[in-house]
């Protein structure tokens, strides 16, 4: 189940390190905890739709991989609708940007924080 779910979220060859990390950490959870976490994912897109309609006035940076097929479309819509939200999309990267491209992730975050 862990490997399958990891492959659904991170299917590309360049996502291998993130998949491996996900599976390793998921195995540390008790099965009951993992199932609760898995069910939580069903609530993500409705939650993102909610946040699209309710703007948070705090400056917010979303760092997403262009290959994050699960969440990027919703986050893109949200950041287009909110003045306080910014989106930084990392090319050739999947769901776990800080693992796949840590230098790019850190640079984007530090640059954003430096402008606040």
Go through each PLM region and give its residues.
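Post-His helix in hydrolase/transferase enzymes
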Residues: 99-113
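Conserved loop-alpha-helix segment in the C-terminal half of the alpha/beta-hydrolase fold
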Residues: 57-93, 99
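Alpha/beta-hydrolase fold catalytic core
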Residues: 28, 114-116
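Short amphipathic alpha-helical segments and helix-helix/interface helices
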Residues: 50-53, 75-76, 110
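Conserved alpha/beta-hydrolase catalytic His-Asp/Glu region
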Residues: 1-54
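Short alpha-helical
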Residues: 32-33, 69-70, 104
């Amino acid at each position: 189940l862990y490997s399958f779910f990891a492959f659904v979220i991170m299917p590309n060859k360049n996502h291998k390190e993130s998949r491996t990390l996900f599976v390793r950490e998921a195995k540390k959870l008790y099965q009951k905890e993992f199932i609760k976490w898995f069910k939580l994912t069903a609530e993500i897109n409705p939650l993102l739709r909610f946040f699209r309609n309710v703007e948070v006035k705090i400056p917010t940076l979303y760092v997403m991989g262009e290959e994050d097929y699960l969440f990027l479309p919703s986050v893109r819509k949200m950041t287009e609708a909110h003045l306080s939200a910014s989106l930084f999309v990392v090319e050739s990267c999947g769901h776990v940007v800080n693992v796949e491209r840590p230098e790019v992730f850190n640079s984007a975050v530090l640059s954003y924080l430096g402008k606040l």
